[in-house]
Swiss-Prot record:
The cytochrome bc1 complex contains 11 subunits: 3 respiratory subunits (MT-CYB, CYC1 and UQCRFS1), 2 core proteins (UQCRC1 and UQCRC2) and 6 low-molecular weight proteins (UQCRH/QCR6, UQCRB/QCR7, UQCRQ/QCR8, UQCR10/QCR9, UQCR11/QCR10 and a cleavage product of UQCRFS1). This cytochrome bc1 complex then forms a dimer. InterPro entries: Cyt_b/b6_C (IPR005798), Cyt_b/b6_C_sf (IPR036150), Cyt_b/b6_N (IPR005797), Cytb/b6-like_sf (IPR027387), Cytochrome_b (IPR030689), Cytochrome_b_C_euk/bac (IPR048260), Cytochrome_b_N_euk/bac (IPR048259), Di-haem_cyt_TM (IPR016174). The gene is MT-CYB. CDD domains: cytochrome_b_C, Cytochrome_b_N. It comes from Myotis bechsteinii. This is Cytochrome b. PROSITE patterns: CYTB_CTER, CYTB_NTER. Heme b b566 binds at residues 97, 196. It is a multi-pass membrane protein. Heme 1 (or BL or b562) is low-potential and absorbs at about 562 nm, and heme 2 (or BH or b566) is high-potential and absorbs at about 566 nm. The chain crosses the membrane at residues 33-53, 77-98, 113-133, 178-198, 226-246, 288-308, 320-340, 347-367.
Amino acid sequence: MTNIRKSHPLMKIINNSFIDLPTPSNISSWWNFGSLLGICLTLQITTGLFLAMHYTSDTATAFNSVTHICRDVNYGWILRYLHANGASMFFICLYLHVGRGLYYGSYMYTETWNIGVILLFTVMATAFMGYVLPWGQMSFWGATVITNLLSAIPYIGTDLVEWIWGGFSVDKATLTRFFAFHFLLPFIITAMVMVHLLFLHETGSNNPMGIPSNADMIPFHPYYTIKDILGLLAMITTLLTLVLFSPDMLGDPDNYTPANPLSTPPHIKPEWYFLFAYAILRSIPNKLGGVLALILSILILIIIPLLHTSKQRSMAFRPLSQCLYWLLVADLLTLTWIGGQPVEYPFVIIGQLASILYLSIIILLMPLTSLVENHLLKW
């Protein structure tokens, strides 16, 4: 008799995706982040669902409803902080996942990569709208500043902004629709994750050496289920330490002040995971130019496969490219720091130099270095 997991229509899909999936025998811990992202998404949807049961998306009561969740709802405080800090863990895992893809040439699976980039955009949009919901000062002004960027679009910009706002400023209509979209998008993300996995399982996973691994595959379970549990324990430990000891460490104190359209905070800035893009936006003194640079800073990932000029897929055996890669990582950390600083000397010039370096490394230096390395192979 055939095992039910191999014959039942639904069990068969699960079996082929998570149990008997042939996996390269040499993938490292950098391949853990896919499963961690799945767990983060599950955590966010679960905590978010329970928070939505007590939250009210009305400008008069939104701030108080969040306070009510933290003070009066049983374990509401832990739900709220798991959700807020869970978003930070989500982005840490996301950036490490993308970084792994860049380092080991996983972007050569173009369908999987492109859906991943769309997923990144969708998760960023979801996080931005979620940040508006507590209706604190930074929520309100963050929403005002970021949505107002669309007014830079020629001809239709102003109409577009007012259409998104649902009025002439960020108000009740804006908050209500942001809540609706913030609730809906995670389910769309879940569907997109399934498509992401569908395309990945068409080709199989890449590996650290960047060479075909068809000759040496092992089943996903028990080898990588056990390996992923280690990563999960590390992530859960970090998240719980953050939630239980310093839940507001990554937040902004201004968001504990109710939204006031008549008082602008001294420094308007987004959550830490958007600071690198915000720094690129601010480094260009022109509004439309800044918006284009902001979008390009993430959309540039789409063209990465076209910029691959190396004869080797992975960076494992390409020391010059490795140096550039870690320079890019340092540059992104610099941009993240600059994004949180006030707009004054010397931060402005550092931000501009870091932005130029970011685009130069990806568009110019990486492809040229790969060509040099191709010649070095002939020595």
